[in-house]
Amino acid sequence: MNAARCFGQATVLLTAISIARAFGLSGPTVISAGLLTALLMLIAWRDGATAADLGLAREDMRAGVRYGVGAFGLVLLILVAIALIPGTNSFLDDSRADISGGRLIYELTISIVLLTAIPEEFAFRGVLLGSGVRLWGPWRASLITSALFGLWHIVPTLHTMSDNRAISSASNNFAGQVLLVTGTVVATFIAGLVFSWLRLRSRSLIAPILAHIATNGLALLIAWFVAH
């Protein structure tokens, strides 16, 4: 595997898409996510990545499911606790949860699973982490790819920071925006480390995909129940 070329090309691609999103040039998410995944698959194939490098080896699927289900359950417990504690449940008061039941199903199944969790995990814990491990070893690769994962979330945070009513007031000034973006980058960096650990421990991409779905999907689901 040409790990250096694979990592470099994937990083350039992700940077280009992130810049395009910042200027509203990436088009519909279904197109940009599909294009990202297809190009990453091409990069991985041309550079000789194996199924094991990408976390897609069949023999590791069972471990991936086991670790992923465990992570899913842990996230559920944490979010339920947040929803039940008066001092923290305001963080689930998000205008993005003010949607119909039909729209909720679409967001959970299409937007979160197919257009977010799977493409992002294939990119960061599949192609980048797989090639990064060959270049620097597991822990340095985890740190680098998790940092990139945090930076990837700058543009979405700028677009959605006013949706959460608990923090929307902070988005009204530049200092507040910097604080919110920095907090999101740090939080997603930590999440990236956890997802990387799941991927390395189980050797399967299924584990971080399930954890990612839990983090995004269960948060939206519980916020929807809070809103309704």
Language-model region placement:
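Alpha-helical transmembrane segments in multi-pass membrane proteins
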Residues: M1-D47, A63, Y67, D98-E107
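Structural signal for the C-terminal ends of transmembrane alpha-helices
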Residues: L42-A51, L198-R201
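Aromatic-anchored segments of alpha-helical transmembrane domains
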Residues: A10-A22, V75-A81, S146-P156, T215-L221
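Hydrophobic alpha-helical transmembrane segments
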Residues: A4-A22, G48-L56, G87-L92, G130-G137, ...
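Juxtamembrane helix-loop-helix connectors linking adjacent transmembrane helices
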Residues: A51-P119, R134, D163-A175
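N-terminal start-of-chain detector that recognizes signal peptides
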Residues: L14-A16, G24-G27, N89, S169, ...
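Transmembrane helix-loop-helix hairpins at the membrane interface
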Residues: I105-H228
